[in-house]
Amino acid sequence: MTGGSGVVVLDNGGGLLKAGFGGDMNPTAVVPNCMAKPPGSKKWLVADQLQAQDVDVTGMTLRRPIDRGYLINQEVQREVWERVIRNLLQVDPNNSSLLLVEPQFNPPALQHATDELVFEELGFKSLCVADAPSLVHLYEASRQPSLFRAQCSLVVDCGFSFTHASPVLQNFTLNYAVRRMDLGGKALTNYLKELISYRSLNVMDETLLIDDAKEKLCFVSLDVPGDLRLARLSSNDNPFRCSYILPDGITYKKGFVKDLDEACRYSSLPANGESVRKDSSDSDRSKFEDKKKPELSQNEFVLTNERFLVPEMLFHPIDLGMNQAGLAECIVRAIQACHPHLQPVLFERIILTGGSTLFPRFTERLEKELRPLVPDDYQVKIIAQEDPILGAWRGGSLLAHRPDFESMCITKSEYEEMGSMRCRRRFFH
């Protein structure tokens, strides 16, 4: 894909906002979709300003425009979009079209609020709206045309606010068959905050730090009972034990993993959860190194079984008191809601997208959970995207680069003449 398009492609995620130009392979900006204010400061930091190396994210007050997947704060969203469009992309909306990735089942009132923001406050000349599953399917079909000759797939989007299993046929999402779990990256971060606060330090106000710790340290277990047994071992023999250092505001302003090798020890374990034996020299060395380790300070916390119990929410939420089906059951229900002729094809084309699918071993665990629920004569094939955070944006970039793209858009003059509801009919929402 090559650049040069006058179309701004905006994937307005609840956690990260991805923005760039139609025809480009990668977005120009991938920034937090929020505003934050440091303790004792009156200045709000917006989007990319939170990513600066000299910014201490400890104890920040957050304001997010998106809650549970939907736009709830138009003022914050305008601030973020203004920052991204004018400062990072450096474009004039009056001379640009916008392709916006919008959440599924967006209520009409929120569609109208979005259109107001796009046309009246930012002044884009035209707008096209698409949902994430159809764009993810479009991108994967362009990469592997032979695999997607049937023109259908099941897109599993494990995002920041929710998880959707969405069948797609000929680039249209089959809304009647979509199944949703009210679990996403935000819920996992909140659960990790609760576990750490109960067992170690009070980190309930450290959303950005714990989000970073979750992304760097959590993984999906292939054998939860076996891993729980290993997690009870002493510190030297515990393959899951690792420390996360909190910023002190002076020496370092970002949190980090204390020992990356220690954090990756679990990856050498066999899948059946058996402990890896150590010879005497390894044991002696570990004892010697353990003596050299400093005592746990107020600026760090230790994780053990939390590392795999947090992602476990996605597979067995009922074990944690949530009255919801797990991810595998959600996928099966979505496929079973489709025509019987589509079902075997969908099981062979399950696409994983969204940041929560980046946990190590996610794909293997999902296949292990899914196989017993699928008829024996059906094949199960799971496609993990190379960069699941950018999947929807890249599909949008492809769509925006098509010659007929402008015919899919509603223009500002059409919006002013007919209003939001009549214009929206063009998008089949």
Curated annotation (Swiss-Prot):
Entry's Gene Ontology molecular function annotations: nucleosome binding
Subcellular location per the Swiss-Prot or TrEMBL entry: Nucleus
Positions with biased composition (Basic and acidic residues): 275-293
Domain of life: Eukaryota
Alphabetized Pfam families for the sequence: Actin
GO biological process per UniProt: cell division; chromatin remodeling; defense response; negative regulation of flower development; regulation of DNA-templated transcription; response to osmotic stress; response to temperature stimulus; seed germination
InterPro entries, alphabetized: Actin (IPR004000), ATPase_NBD (IPR043129)
Ranges in coiled-coil conformation: none
Primary localisation category: nucleus
Sequence segments annotated as region (Disordered): 272-293
Keywords: Chromatin regulator, Developmental protein, Nucleus, Plant defense
CDD domains recorded: ASKHA_NBD_Arp6
Subunit structure: Component of the SWR1 chromatin-remodeling complex.
Stated family: Belongs to the actin family. ARP6 subfamily.
Protein purpose: Component of the SWR1 complex which mediates the ATP-dependent exchange of histone H2A for the H2A variant H2A.F/Z leading to transcriptional regulation of selected genes by chromatin remodeling. Involved in several developmental processes. May be involved in the regulation of pathogenesis-related proteins (PRs).
Protein name: Actin-related protein 6
Organism: Oryza sativa subsp. japonica (Rice)
Record gene name: ARP6
